[in-house]
Amino acid sequence: MNSFNNTFPMISGPSFARKAVLATALSLTLGAPAFAQTTATTTATFEVTAINEISLSGTAPVLTINAAVAGVAPTPTTASQTYAVTTNETAKISAALDAAMPDGLTLTAAMAAPTGATSLSAVALTTTGQDLVTGISKLNEAGLALTYGLAATSAAGVVGSSNRVITYTITAI
């Protein structure tokens, strides 16, 4: 061996290389500042409130009775629109007129039932809310048929053009 290896026998050879790498890694790790990890938290507050919405589409109905068969009451007439409904509760739809119909005239409304609900067919409208659809439960549907009917007795006589505001209400039950 040469004089260097004789004087410092521990710093030569493969085990020295391993120890040197380990010592270097250790000194870098211990000598380096620790990296701090920072976190933050928050609390998300959420809520879904009751949603009961109804809308109408299409032209407002115009109903004209202008024909009859001899010996029979005047021929009823119909008109239609569509409606859409969204609810996240169990609900029903009712309708009411803003004023009573003239004697001898009956205005009806029939709403197609959304999935799982029940339509009460053609219901005569009055100034008191009349149920048209019941059992509506947590859904949203559009393009549902809404059909109006106007029937008259001969005793109604001639009735000039008039109108009634129909208010549809969706109510949680």
Language-model regions, residue ranges each:
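General helical secondary-structure elements
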Residues: 14-15, 33, 160
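N-terminal small/polar-rich segments of proteins
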Residues: 37-120, 125-173
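Bacterial N-terminal signal peptides that target proteins for export
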Residues: 3-22
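Serine/proline-rich low-complexity intrinsically disordered segments, especially terminal tails, linkers
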Residues: 5, 14, 29, 82, ...
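Hydrophobic core
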Residues: 24-33
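General helical structural elements
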Residues: 22-23, 168
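Sec/Tat signal peptide C-region and signal peptidase I cleavage site
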Residues: 19, 32-36
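Helix-centric, low-specificity signal for extended rod-like, repetitive segments
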Residues: 11-12, 30, 74, 157
